[in-house]
Design a protein with these regions (language model features):
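Short, glycine-/small-residue-rich phosphate/pyrophosphate-handling segment
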Residues: 128-161
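A short helix->loop->beta-strand "cap" motif at the edges of active sites that frequently abuts
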Residues: 122-126
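Short, surface-exposed basic-aromatic patches at helix termini and helix-loop junctions that form
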Residues: 116-121, 146-150
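A mature extracytoplasmic/lumenal domain signature
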Residues: 28-29, 102, 131-134
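Sec-dependent N-terminal signal peptides
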Residues: 5-14
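Generic recognition of short, well-ordered alpha-helical segments
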Residues: 35, 109-113, 139-143
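N-terminal beta1-alpha1-beta2 submodule of the flavodoxin-like/Rossmannoid cofactor-binding fold
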Residues: 18-98, 105-107, 116
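N-terminal secretory signal peptides that target proteins for export/translocation
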Residues: 1-2
Length: 163
Protein backbone atom coordinates (compact mmCIF):
# COMPACT_ATOMS: atom_id res chain seq x y z
CA UNK A 1 0.00 0.00 0.00
CA UNK A 2 2.79 2.40 0.92
CA UNK A 3 4.50 1.71 -2.44
CA UNK A 4 1.29 2.68 -4.25
CA UNK A 5 1.05 5.96 -2.33
CA UNK A 6 4.68 6.80 -3.06
CA UNK A 7 4.18 5.88 -6.71
CA UNK A 8 1.02 8.02 -6.91
CA UNK A 9 2.83 10.99 -5.36
CA UNK A 10 5.75 10.52 -7.75
CA UNK A 11 3.40 10.40 -10.75
CA UNK A 12 1.55 13.50 -9.54
CA UNK A 13 4.86 15.33 -9.20
CA UNK A 14 5.82 14.31 -12.74
CA UNK A 15 2.48 15.46 -14.13
CA UNK A 16 2.76 18.77 -12.27
CA UNK A 17 6.26 19.22 -13.65
CA UNK A 18 5.06 18.45 -17.19
CA UNK A 19 2.20 20.90 -16.84
CA UNK A 20 4.60 23.61 -15.74
CA UNK A 21 6.93 23.15 -18.69
CA UNK A 22 8.18 26.06 -20.73
CA UNK A 23 8.89 26.53 -24.43
CA UNK A 24 11.01 29.24 -26.03
CA UNK A 25 9.84 29.57 -29.64
CA UNK A 26 11.66 32.14 -31.73
CA UNK A 27 12.34 33.46 -35.21
CA UNK A 28 15.79 34.84 -35.92
CA UNK A 29 16.78 36.39 -39.23
CA UNK A 30 20.44 37.15 -38.46
CA UNK A 31 21.26 35.15 -35.32
CA UNK A 32 20.76 37.91 -32.72
CA UNK A 33 17.36 36.65 -31.54
CA UNK A 34 18.64 33.07 -31.63
CA UNK A 35 21.41 33.95 -29.16
CA UNK A 36 18.90 35.67 -26.86
CA UNK A 37 16.52 32.70 -27.13
CA UNK A 38 19.26 30.24 -26.18
CA UNK A 39 20.09 32.27 -23.06
CA UNK A 40 16.42 32.56 -22.11
CA UNK A 41 15.87 28.82 -22.57
CA UNK A 42 18.90 28.03 -20.41
CA UNK A 43 17.68 30.39 -17.65
CA UNK A 44 14.24 28.75 -17.57
CA UNK A 45 15.28 25.15 -18.32
CA UNK A 46 12.98 25.40 -21.34
CA UNK A 47 12.77 23.61 -24.64
CA UNK A 48 14.05 25.68 -27.56
CA UNK A 49 12.20 25.79 -30.90
CA UNK A 50 13.23 27.79 -33.94
CA UNK A 51 10.42 29.11 -36.11
CA UNK A 52 11.91 28.70 -39.57
CA UNK A 53 10.52 29.99 -42.86
CA UNK A 54 10.00 27.38 -45.58
CA UNK A 55 12.02 29.69 -47.81
CA UNK A 56 14.98 31.11 -45.85
CA UNK A 57 15.52 34.86 -45.93
CA UNK A 58 18.50 36.15 -47.91
CA UNK A 59 20.39 39.36 -47.17
CA UNK A 60 18.49 40.99 -50.05
CA UNK A 61 15.18 39.79 -48.54
CA UNK A 62 16.05 41.52 -45.28
CA UNK A 63 16.99 44.90 -46.80
CA UNK A 64 14.50 47.14 -45.01
CA UNK A 65 15.61 50.16 -47.07
CA UNK A 66 14.38 48.48 -50.27
CA UNK A 67 10.60 48.84 -50.64
CA UNK A 68 10.57 45.78 -52.92
CA UNK A 69 12.49 43.45 -50.60
CA UNK A 70 10.67 40.40 -49.27
CA UNK A 71 10.58 41.68 -45.70
CA UNK A 72 9.28 45.09 -46.81
CA UNK A 73 6.53 43.53 -48.90
CA UNK A 74 5.52 41.15 -46.10
CA UNK A 75 5.34 43.93 -43.53
CA UNK A 76 3.26 46.17 -45.81
CA UNK A 77 0.52 43.52 -45.98
CA UNK A 78 -1.13 42.80 -42.59
CA UNK A 79 -2.65 39.61 -44.00
CA UNK A 80 0.68 38.17 -45.22
CA UNK A 81 1.58 34.85 -43.58
CA UNK A 82 4.93 33.40 -44.71
CA UNK A 83 4.97 29.61 -44.81
CA UNK A 84 6.70 27.93 -41.90
CA UNK A 85 9.07 25.02 -42.49
CA UNK A 86 7.67 22.93 -39.62
CA UNK A 87 5.37 23.47 -36.63
CA UNK A 88 5.85 22.28 -33.09
CA UNK A 89 3.33 20.71 -30.74
CA UNK A 90 2.58 23.31 -28.06
CA UNK A 91 0.03 21.26 -26.12
CA UNK A 92 2.52 20.18 -23.42
CA UNK A 93 3.58 23.70 -22.44
CA UNK A 94 1.96 26.12 -20.02
CA UNK A 95 4.32 29.03 -20.63
CA UNK A 96 5.62 29.96 -24.06
CA UNK A 97 8.13 32.70 -24.75
CA UNK A 98 7.66 33.98 -28.31
CA UNK A 99 10.78 35.67 -29.67
CA UNK A 100 11.51 37.77 -32.72
CA UNK A 101 13.49 40.72 -34.05
CA UNK A 102 11.48 43.95 -34.21
CA UNK A 103 10.51 44.69 -37.82
CA UNK A 104 8.74 47.96 -38.56
CA UNK A 105 8.00 48.35 -34.84
CA UNK A 106 6.25 44.97 -34.49
CA UNK A 107 6.86 41.24 -34.90
CA UNK A 108 7.67 39.83 -38.35
CA UNK A 109 4.69 38.25 -40.15
CA UNK A 110 6.19 34.79 -39.67
CA UNK A 111 5.25 35.12 -35.99
CA UNK A 112 1.63 35.56 -37.09
CA UNK A 113 2.03 32.41 -39.19
CA UNK A 114 3.27 30.46 -36.18
CA UNK A 115 0.52 31.75 -33.89
CA UNK A 116 -2.17 31.12 -36.51
CA UNK A 117 -0.87 27.57 -37.07
CA UNK A 118 -1.04 26.85 -33.33
CA UNK A 119 -4.50 28.24 -32.60
CA UNK A 120 -6.53 27.20 -30.63
CA UNK A 121 -3.85 25.25 -28.68
CA UNK A 122 -2.34 28.56 -27.53
CA UNK A 123 -5.55 29.83 -25.93
CA UNK A 124 -4.87 28.41 -22.45
CA UNK A 125 -1.16 29.18 -22.43
CA UNK A 126 0.74 32.06 -20.89
CA UNK A 127 2.53 33.83 -23.73
CA UNK A 128 5.47 36.14 -23.12
CA UNK A 129 6.86 37.99 -26.13
CA UNK A 130 10.55 38.81 -26.25
CA UNK A 131 12.38 40.75 -28.89
CA UNK A 132 15.70 42.06 -30.05
CA UNK A 133 16.13 45.40 -31.75
CA UNK A 134 18.80 47.89 -32.67
CA UNK A 135 16.66 50.88 -31.74
CA UNK A 136 12.99 50.03 -31.05
CA UNK A 137 11.25 49.11 -27.83
CA UNK A 138 8.87 46.16 -27.48
CA UNK A 139 5.77 48.15 -26.50
CA UNK A 140 4.36 48.53 -30.02
CA UNK A 141 4.92 44.82 -30.73
CA UNK A 142 3.16 43.89 -27.46
CA UNK A 143 0.18 46.10 -28.30
CA UNK A 144 0.02 44.62 -31.81
CA UNK A 145 0.02 41.03 -30.52
CA UNK A 146 -2.62 41.75 -27.87
CA UNK A 147 -4.86 43.50 -30.42
CA UNK A 148 -4.37 40.87 -33.14
CA UNK A 149 -4.84 37.92 -30.78
CA UNK A 150 -7.13 39.19 -27.99
CA UNK A 151 -8.18 35.69 -26.85
CA UNK A 152 -4.61 34.76 -25.94
CA UNK A 153 -3.15 35.36 -22.49
CA UNK A 154 -0.24 37.76 -23.09
CA UNK A 155 2.15 38.87 -20.35
CA UNK A 156 4.43 41.89 -20.55
CA UNK A 157 7.28 41.36 -22.96
CA UNK A 158 11.03 41.47 -22.69
CA UNK A 159 13.50 43.39 -24.82
CA UNK A 160 16.71 41.33 -24.84
CA UNK A 161 19.32 43.48 -26.51
CA UNK A 162 23.04 43.11 -26.04
CA UNK A 163 24.32 45.94 -23.89
Amino acid sequence: MMKRIVLALFCAACITNMNASTLVAYFSATGTTKAAAKQLAAQHNARLWEIEPAQPYTAADLDWRNDKSRSSLEMKDPEERPTIKQCTDVTHYDTIYVGFPIWWGICPRIINSWIDNNLPQLENKTLIPFATSGSSGIEEAEAYLKKTYPTLKWKNGLLLNKR
